[in-house]
Amino acid sequence: MKRYLSLALAALVLTGCVPPDSVTPTPPVTIEPVTPPDVEVPPPVDTVPQPPKVQSIDWAVSVEPLVAQMVNSDEVATGSILLVDSVKNNTNGALQTAKATAALHQVLSSNKKFVLISPQQLGVAKQTLGLSEEDSFGSRSKAIGLARYVGAQYVLYSDVSGDVKSPTIEMQLMQTQTGEIIWSGNAPVQY
């Protein structure tokens, strides 16, 4: 048994010995990192959204034909006192109704059929009644009540309705004493 053991030990020792010729050392491999080429990245550009295009409404052209129809009405006496109610916006968007009211005043004042209640008189009357200058009458009955207070014989009630891109202006001329609508008309708004 000693013999087998010494033989096995000799075999292990001999297998561990390798002649120096057969093993060639390999040089260490150096890996160089690859650098990507420098690409200049432009700074991010903040794009400003374009504002919506606001179409300018020519209110004077829009109201002139309606005023001409109203003035030619047989129901209205020349020299009558008229209160022009501010134009209401009943569209699905924003409109410059103050410009519409100013254009309506301008077109009516160039026509001598009515004597207009001035914006200053209207302001004083509103202040006396406890209303602010910016208050619109909101309803026909309030407009008629204010017209009675300032001594007007007629009230012109106007509103713009429909789609804001193609609105329609409607006007109603009412007698102050009875509230009767003696003339009404409507027309598309002109851009």
From Swiss-Prot:
Family assignment from sequence similarity: Belongs to the LpoB family.
Signal sequence coordinates: 1-16
Gene Ontology process terms (BP): peptidoglycan biosynthetic process; regulation of cell shape
Lipid-bearing positions (N-palmitoyl cysteine): 17
Keyword Membrane found: yes
Main subcellular localisation: membrane
Domain of life: Bacteria
PANTHER family: PENICILLIN-BINDING PROTEIN ACTIVATOR LPOB (PTHR40593:SF1)
Function comment: Regulator of peptidoglycan synthesis that is essential for the function of penicillin-binding protein 1B (PBP1b).
UniProt topology in membrane: Lipid-anchor
Name under which the protein is recorded: Penicillin-binding protein activator LpoB
GO molecular function: enzyme regulator activity
Assembly information from the UniProt record: Interacts with PBP1b.
Organism: Yersinia pestis
GO-annotated cellular components: periplasmic side of cell outer membrane
Swiss-Prot/TrEMBL keywords: Cell outer membrane, Cell shape, Lipoprotein, Membrane, Palmitate, Peptidoglycan synthesis, Signal
S-diacylglycerol cysteine lipid modification positions: 17
Pfam family, one: LpoB
